[in-house]
Amino acid sequence: MIKLVYCITKKSGLTDREFFDYWKNVHGPIGTRIPGLRKLVQSHRLPVPGDKHQPDRQKFDGIAELWFDDVEALLAARQSPEWQTSTADEANFIDHTKVAYFVSEEHILLDNLSPQP
């Protein structure tokens, strides 16, 4: 299983609320139709009052994680009309000059999210 990770920044002129609402409720359903996509997660930035550890250089507003079986499935998905529709829609809420992405393989070192007996 591989994961495509997008670090995104909202388009200028959008409030946080407008950005997160559009991303989740309009763009999100578009993304769920991408063929071969096994899992889709959005992580929306939360402000932390007094946080001095946020870098001043690049500030992202969120992260999208798209899981595929393998790189071949990702490459096939990128050729699909659904991917093209999703990419075109990004212009409505993302500043493409402030985006970073990479393909990764997850290595879980700790998972205490499951209830313990």
Which residues are covered by each model-predicted region?
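Macromolecular interaction modules
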Residues: 1-117
